[in-house]
């Protein structure tokens, strides 16, 4: 570009003359040249030639100006990059020349070098020699402290070029890089590329230099303690080295290679690897098989496949070996079949093919058994695998092997370490015993099944619940064979024996003692006793059941379900008062309010069903809802009491006490109101209270509506609208119901007052309020006139304006937009500040703008 012939008339205009005069007067002033360039660049008519005309003269005058050269180079690069026309070689070389000129005096400017090298890589990737020479020249001129700026580009160039050039670049980087960086210990330090020695090895292999890669592998494997920071573990590096050797052997066709020595070296390498990584048996055996397949030594390949399957200890290794083994055999069979087709009938080859086919089929069929054996070698206490093994033999209908497997499992498993990795409920040690006994029971061999159960309950287990399961199944064995007496003897022997006082959860006590307090076993015992009763005349049997229930209560193992079952049993045999006493006993035993609520719920329903004295029932309802004589009971919690109040109210109504029914619902609202203000309720419980409160309002309103007492109905609606605890959606729903009620009565002034009230509750544009405005408009169209419609529109404009002012005020007071928490909806300040309208004799008595 320096050799261009300039057309002065085409490059200069009258506006340029002052700037030309300045640079002519003081050509060595950088500011003059920069002002001139910036002015010219800002004009719409400025072309690439205009810029170059100024910059070329500037850099000639100030050849050491880094700033001018950078501007010049950026202009040239931009022109080359944005030009849509074909770029000739001469144009590219002219850009090269600009860079070369700049670097003659600024050869220590890394940014110039980077721009130059990036340009060369992008536009002249085929000039390998030029690129390599310029990279080396750059590294030679720049101080070593700045080399880290160049190496990323140099490495990218090496990756693109590959081959021996790429190898030389990476080996050169190997000399430059910090040893700690190569070891993966200090890759975050400034100037490090994050390239480790294993990355370099990968590149050397990719570029075809196996010899250099092998040297680096050996160096790493001999000093694994120094390379702990690498992204690849020593195991990964070891396997990569093995793969490298396998691939190099398969490519080596020279007859001078001593394969026997190489085989010995390779097998020794694998054995050394097994010593270092004993948990990688499968993977290393697989490498051996691949090696001998490459060597076409199929006998040794099969030998190591079999050895691998016998010694591997992980599913991953087993799957890899087995899949590779089957693929290997399939390929052999395919090759033999193709060979047989070409040769025609060949008895020897045919026999060999049949033999190999049988071996292959056996290998496929044995897979689940081989895998199961491997899993049991890995963990003999894994119940899942023992159950799988039994299922395998069951599918084959091999009863003898099933029984042998049961016996082997129960003989081998440590009961205190038995577990199910899959967390399957059915895969338990008790079920192993039970299934074992059931094999004989299914063949009507009750004697052997009984013997197995008798041995099972003497074994150790991890929890008393396991032992209880065995006792239950043992009893079921005799129940199924119509020997209920023997079943009861077995369970009574354990449940009624004297054991003294102990804690069921005390792990220091033998489970054979703790099982006496197993509610699971007691529940079965109770069910068994109850099943023996057929009529009311069996007094002794009934008393025996009652006594058993009382023992569970005395042992303090009764659950809420036990109490309910006890009460149901007594009710079933017409012991009603004793049934009610059972419920009351449960209320005394259990302290949890939710449990008490459930018991009360059932108790009250039952006592209403039997139509006892009304005062007694009322007294029970009052005890349930409020503090009672029951120790530690302070009344039903507010978040649970709604069903009780509804049941109580419905009961009173069914007895003709309508006023009391309504009063009870009002009491419920009061209790919920007080409960919502208590701090000990959680947010979720308070949300429940609000929902229950709204539901009670709905029930209360529906009751009053049936009376056709308009004044009482209005009072309830007004009460609900004054309730500041209800949510906005609830208030809106109640208001709209109130509006419909007044509309049916043609109390239009009241309706308008209600519309005004509800429309003030939130922003007129909110999704909740906007439909209400539409309803109001519809109402005025149907029942109003032009004046009332205009009044509605004026009110709407006022509300919109007030809300806009309210928002502006809030934003000015709280510019960060923090929101203060609140409880329930609050009526807008509009309702407070709005002027009162004239008194309306038909208006509703609410705290709202009417």
Curated annotation (Swiss-Prot):
Q: What is this protein called?
A: Pre-mRNA-splicing factor SYF1
Question: Where is this protein chiefly located?
Answer: nucleus
Keywords (A to Z) from UniProt:
mRNA processing, mRNA splicing, Nucleus, Repeat, Spliceosome
Q: Which GO terms describe its cellular component?
A: post-mRNA release spliceosomal complex; Prp19 complex; U2-type catalytic step 2 spliceosome
SMART domains per the record?
A: HAT
Pfam families recorded for this chain?
Answer: HAT_Syf1_CNRKL1_C (PF23231), HAT_Syf1_CNRKL1_N (PF23233), HAT_Syf1_M (PF23220)
Oligomer and partners: Associated with the spliceosome.
Role of this protein: Involved in pre-mRNA splicing and cell cycle progression.
Source organism: Debaryomyces hansenii (strain ATCC 36239 / CBS 767 / BCRC 21394 / JCM 1990 / NBRC 0083 / IGC 2968) (Yeast)
Provide the gene name from the record.
SYF1
Similarity annotation = Belongs to the crooked-neck family.
Family annotation (InterPro entries): HAT, HAT_Syf1-like_N, HAT_Syf1_central, HAT_Syf1_CNRKL1_C, Syf1-like, TPR-like_helical_dom_sf
Q: Which GO terms describe its biological process?
A: generation of catalytic spliceosome for first transesterification step
Spans of the HAT repeats are: 10-42, 46-78, 90-122, 126-160, 208-247, 408-442, 444-480, 500-531, 574-609, 612-653, 708-744, 746-782
């Amino acid at each position: 570009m320096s050799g261009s012939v300039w057309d002065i008339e085409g490059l200069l205009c009258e506006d340029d003359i002052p700037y030309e005069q300045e640079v002519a007067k003081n050509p060595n002033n950088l500011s003059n040249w920069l002002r001139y360039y910036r002015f010219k660049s800002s004009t719409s008519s400025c072309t690439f030639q205009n810029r170059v005309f100024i910059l070329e003269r500037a850099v000639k005058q100030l050849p050491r100006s880094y700033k001018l050269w950078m501007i010049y180079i950026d202009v040239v690069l931009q022109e080359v990059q944005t030009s849509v026309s074909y770029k000739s070689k001469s144009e590219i070389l002219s850009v090269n020349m600009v860079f070369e000129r700049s670097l003659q005096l600024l050869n220590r400017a890394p940014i110039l070098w980077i721009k130059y090298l990036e340009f060369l890589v992008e536009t002249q990737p085929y000039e390998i020699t030029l690129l390599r020479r310029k990279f080396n020249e750059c590294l030679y001129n720049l101080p070593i402290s700045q080399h880290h700026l160049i190496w990323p580009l140099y490495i990218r160039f090496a990756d693109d070029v590959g081959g021996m050039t790429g190898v030389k670049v990476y080996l050169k980087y190997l000399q430059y890089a910090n040893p700690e960086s190569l070891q993966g210990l200090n890759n975050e330090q400034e100037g490090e590329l994050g390239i480790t020695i294993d990355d370099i090895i990968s590149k050397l292999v990719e570029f075809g230099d196996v010899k250099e890669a092998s040297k680096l592998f050996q160096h790493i494997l001999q000093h694994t303690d120094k390379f702990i920071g690498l992204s690849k573990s020593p195991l990964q590096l070891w396997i990569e080295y093995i793969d490298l050797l396998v691939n190099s052997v398969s490519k080596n066709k020279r007859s001078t290679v001593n394969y026997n020595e190489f085989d010995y070296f390779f097998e020794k390498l694998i054995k050394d690897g097994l010593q270092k990584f004993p948990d990688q048996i499968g993977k290393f055996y697989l490498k051996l098989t691949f090696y001998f397949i490459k060597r076409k030594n199929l006998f040794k390949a099969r030998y190591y496949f079999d050895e691998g399957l016998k010694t591997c200890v992980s599913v991953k290794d087993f799957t890899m070996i087995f899949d590779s083994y089957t693929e290997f055999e399939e390929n052999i069979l395919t090759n033999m079949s193709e060979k047989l087709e070409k040769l025609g009938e060949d008895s020897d080859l045919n026999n060999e093919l049949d033999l190999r086919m049988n071996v292959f089929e056996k290998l496929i069929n044995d897979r689940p058994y081989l895998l199961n054996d491997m899993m049991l070698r890995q963990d003999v206490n894994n119940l899942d695998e023992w159950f799988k093994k039994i299922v395998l033999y069951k599918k084959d209908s091999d009863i003898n092997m099933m029984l042998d497997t049961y016996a082997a499992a129960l003989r081998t498993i440590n009961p205190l370490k038995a577990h199910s990795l899959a967390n399957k409920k059915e895969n338990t040690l008790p079920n192993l015993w039970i299934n074992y006994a059931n094999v004989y029971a299914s063949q009507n061999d009750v004697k052997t099944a009984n013997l197995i159960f008798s041995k099972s309950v003497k074994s150790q287990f991890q929890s008393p619940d396991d032992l209880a399961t065995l006792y239950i199944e043992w009893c079921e064995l005799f129940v199924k064979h119509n020997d209920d007496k023997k079943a009861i003897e077995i369970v009574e022997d354990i449940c009624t024996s004297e054991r003294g006082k102990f804690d069921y959860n005390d792990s220091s006590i033998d489970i054979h003692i703790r099982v006496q307090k197993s509610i699971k076993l007691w529940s079965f015992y109770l069910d068994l006793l109850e099943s023996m009763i057929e009529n009311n005349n069996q007094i002794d049997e009934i008393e025996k059941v009652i006594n058993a229930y009382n023992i569970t209560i005395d042992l303090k193992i009764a659950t809420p379900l036990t109490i309910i079952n006890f009460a149901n049993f007594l009710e079933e045999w017409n012991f009603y008062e004793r049934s009610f006493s059972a419920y009351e006993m449960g209320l005394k035993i259990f302290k949890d309010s939710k449990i008490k609520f459930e018991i009360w719920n059932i108790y009250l329903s039952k006592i209403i069903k039997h139509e006892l004295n009304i005062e007694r029932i009322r007294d029970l309802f009052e005890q349930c809802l409020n503090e009672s004589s029951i120790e530690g009971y302070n009344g039903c919690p507010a978040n649970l009491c709604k069903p009780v109040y509804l049941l109580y109210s419905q009961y009173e109504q069914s007895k003709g006490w309508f006023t009391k029914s309504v009063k009870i619902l009002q009491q419920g609202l009061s209790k919920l109101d007080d409960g919502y203000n208590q701090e000990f309720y959680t947010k979720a419980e308070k949300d429940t209270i609000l929902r229950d409160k709204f539901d009670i309002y709905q029930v209360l309103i529906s009751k009053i509506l049936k009376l056709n007492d308009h004044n009482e109905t209005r009072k309830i609606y007004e009460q609900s609208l004054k309730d500041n605890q209800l949510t906005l959606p609830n208030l809106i729903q109640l208001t709209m119901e109130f509006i419909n009620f007044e509309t049916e009565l043609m109390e239009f002034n009241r309706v308008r007052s209600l519309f005004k009230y509800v429309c003030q509750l939130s922003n007129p544009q909110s999704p909740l309020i906007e439909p209400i405005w539409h309803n109001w408009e519809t109402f005025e169209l149907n029942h109003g006139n032009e004046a009332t419609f205009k009044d509605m529109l004026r009110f709407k404009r006022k509300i919109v304006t007030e809300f806009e002012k309210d928002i502006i005020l809030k934003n000015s007071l709280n510019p960060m937009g923090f929101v203060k928490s609140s409880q329930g909806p609050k009526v807008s300040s509009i309702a407070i500040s709005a002027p009162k309208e004239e008194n309306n004799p038909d208006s509703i008595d609410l705290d709202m703008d009417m």
